[in-house]
Design a protein with these regions (language model features):
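Membrane-embedded alpha-helical bundles of multi-pass transporters/translocases
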Residues: 2-465
């Protein structure tokens, strides 16, 4: 029996464009914040890393909090759309603040300014916006194929935006003057673009009525869960923990790739290569995303596709290490592209996997916590990205790197090589290991069989994939 379709092509594109706004924040922050702070503002990489790590302690609480708030929200716009729409206003303001540290401030005041603006951006506004955006996957359609398509559209926009930001920002900043004020100007422009696109995205989709989401019956207040109860439901779901772990590892990987700006500048002696490597990463990802929905259908699920993709990614990153020690930039780019091609399918279908994870909680616990379930996206992105950026700072500080110096010691150059060549390979191996155990689709099929639920009835009956 063919599943009911809920979305037009423009709904899918409109939804996907929301990650343009998300990556205006995320790609800009993770790729360039550290180099701005160390080389333009003159702050110590190790201290910045420590402040970021401390900020992450706050994030774990806010992810579960906002997920729980979305589950409790009832408005004319729906459950998630208000949080997505209004949360980005704060994102835009605090993004500018992160790149607008007053040069007249003393060192301590500069650290304080950064810590406050960074914590508000990640722990409050980006959290509210990103969890709501991700939760829409479960709230605007009950069709499993459409959910995979939404994920593909979303990450095509995400990686296209990441590609553009990584490719043009260095030159853009130089054209604006190359100093701290230039970074502020670029941040303002990016924030405005993100705000406009996020608004368009939020208004391009409509959440399904609660009557339809809940099998014709609106949940009463007794079905609302407190944050503590929602947290308990999450940790009982082993697949949620796996997805969180994978997200964190992905963002650690991304932070090391972002640290490539140091590797290109000091080891390869050409900072403009950072933009060229961005093409080698993002174009294959986009190509893989285009074919992900077809491959999911061909292989009758996401598990085999994701695992095989990451086997390819590990091979690609291992060859990048070899090419790096050979000193061959063309080979490094080619193998970087191979690794990215393997990573693409998981990027495209992860939201559908999370929907299956939410279904697993419903089947095992009899309770639905869609908004809170999608906290793993924001939690993983922020904790992984934040810790990754912090680790970059700590490792640079440990190696003796000083951003304002004209030359760097050999220990710093060796550390940059380790961060850019070896750590991404290690993280890919760990992700492959986790994905080998993330067969939530089969687990759900077994549970449905035990409960006597027909496979073709589940989407409509359970509101999830």
């Amino acid at each position: 029996m063919e599943e009911k379709k809920y979305l037009k092509w423009y709904n899918k594109i409109g939804y996907g464009s929301g990650d343009v706004a998300g990556n205006v924040v995320y790609a800009f922050l993770t790729s360039f914040m550290m180099v701005y702070l160390t080389d333009s503002v003159g702050l110590a990489a190790g201290v910045v890393g420590t402040l970021i790590a401390v900020s992450k302690l706050f994030d774990g609480f806010t992810d579960i909090f906002f997920g729980s708030m979305i589950d409790k929200t009832h408005s004319k716009m729906g459950k998630a759309k208000p949080w997505m729409l209004y949360g980005y206003i704060g994102c835009a303001i605090t993004l500018v603040c992160c790149f607008a540290i007053p040069v007249s401030f003393g060192t301590t005041a500069k650290y304080a300014w950064f810590f406050i603006s960074y914590t508000l951006l990640n722990g409050v506004f980006y959290t509210a916006n990103n969890i709501a955006y991700s939760a829409l996957t479960s709230l605007i359609t009950k069709n499993s194929k459409e959910r995979v398509q939404m994920g593909s559209y979303r990450f095509i926009f995400a990686f296209s935006t990441s590609l553009l930001i990584q490719a043009i920002t260095v030159g853009f900043v130089d054209k604006c003057g190359g100093d701290a004020a230039a970074w502020r100007t670029v941040a303002i422009i990016y924030a405005i673009i993100g705000l406009v696109v996020n608004t368009i995205s939020a208004l391009s989709v409509k959440e399904l009525p609660e009557e339809e989401l809940n099998e014709g019956e609106v949940k009463d207040d007794n079905e609302k869960y407190g944050m503590v109860q929602a947290f308990k439901l999450l940790v009982k779901n082993k697949y949620y923990m796996m997805i969180c772990g994978t997200y964190i590892l992905q963002q650690l990987y991304g932070a090391m790739i972002g640290a490539g700006i140091y590797y290109m500048t000091w080891v390869l002696k050409n900072k403009n290569l950072f933009g060229q490597f961005a093409w080698a990463v993002n174009i294959p990802l986009i190509i893989a995303l285009i074919f992900t929905p077809t491959l999911v259908g061909k292989w009758k699920g996401m598990y085999k596709l994701n695992l095989r993709g990451y086997v390819l990614a590990v091979i690609g990153r291992a060859l990048v290490v070899v090419a790096g020690y050979m000193g061959s930039v063309p080979l490094m780019m080619a193998f970087t592209a191979l690794a990215a091609l393997g990573q693409g399918p998981w990027q495209g279908d992860m939201n559908a996997v999370i929907a299956s994870c939410s279904e697993y909680t419903y089947l095992t616990q009899g309770k639905r916590i869609d908004g809170t379930m999608y906290s793993c996206t924001s939690l993983g992105v922020k904790i992984g990205g934040g810790i990754g950026t912090a680790v970059v700072g700590w490792l640079l500080e440990f190696s003796g790197y000083i951003g304002t110096n004209a030359t760097q010691p050999q220990s710093a150059l060796d550390m940059m090589q380790f961060m850019y060549l070896w750590l991404p390979l290690i993280f890919d191996v760990l992700i492959m290991f986790v994905l080998s155990r993330m067969n939530v689709e089969d687990a759900n099929k077994k549970l449905k069989a035990e409960k006597g639920i027909a496979a073709d009835e589940v989407t409509d009956a359970l509101d999830i994939n």
